[in-house]
Amino acid sequence: PQALSAMCPTLLALTSARDLGVILDSELSFDKHISKLSQSCFFRLRRLRAIRASLSSSALHTLVHAFICSRLDFCNSTFYGLKASNVDRLQSIFNAAARLLLNVPKFEHISVAIRDALHWLPVKQRIEFKVCLLVRNCLKGSAPEYLRELCVTIGMNEFRPNTRAAERGDLFEPRVRTERFGRRGFSAAGPHMWNSLPTDITQLATTNGTDT
């Protein structure tokens, strides 16, 4: 770590820091956070497996959602753009949780069962869904102002002329120079993903009065 000294005792820069339960590192790789998360979730899965015979199906589902799914979904919009190896690590936790719920052997294929029996989205799609949900909340005015300011329709942006995209209500996508920090930011990722959705879905999502 680099040291910082300016008329005060030398301060060492940290390579990672915890904020709201998420471990952030200087490269935004989330390697350390995912390692801690994986360790914690697999520990809880082992404990649940040990008492599985004493639990009803509904109780087991409740415990898995409380101790596993909720932890994996917490702040998962920050995982957008993760390298594939880390996405796979998160998916392995979901797979293990699904095997516990469905009593599927370790080496048996689980993806179809996750989709058909549990109706769970894969990790990558769960992350993308959370980003789109945040955009939807911004457009409906229920998100914090600092996020709403990042979701501006093309017709409202004075730097862009009226186009067919403006007629569709597409969001303004800022130019970014870097993949790691620019394209993964909500200001770029949110509008890009929202604009890629079919128009009938975006219109339904923003006109529906029920928050989900």
Regions of interest found by a model, annotated:
Residues 1-212:
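Hydrophobic/basic alpha-helical segments
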